[in-house]
Amino acid sequence: GGGGGGGGYPGHGGGGGGYPGHGGGGGGGGGRHRHRHRHRHTA
């Protein structure tokens, strides 16, 4: 298998490819690392 695409979350890479015989490059990570929880700000 080949490399996967870019990760959906910032700072995280992608997974492996699912199609045999096809080599793919790994995707780049996102922007700054963000925590799962977010503080509630006044909108």
UniProtKB/Swiss-Prot annotation:
Ranges of biased composition (kind: Basic residues): 31-43
Give the chief site where it resides. Answer: secreted
Q: Does the keyword Secreted apply?
A: yes
What is the scientific name of the source organism?
Elymus repens
Q: What does this protein do?
A: Responsible for plasticity of the cell wall. Might play a role in wound healing and plant disease resistance.
The family this protein is said to belong to: Belongs to the GRP family.
* Cellular localisation: Secreted, Cell wall
Q: Which UniProt keywords apply?
A: Antimicrobial, Cell wall, Fungicide, Secreted
Recorded protein name is Glycine-rich cell wall structural protein
An example GO biological process term is: defense response to fungus
| Region: Disordered, residue numbers | 1-43
GO terms under cellular component: extracellular region
- Sections of the chain in a coiled coil: none
UniProt lists compositionally biased (Gly residues) regions at 1-30
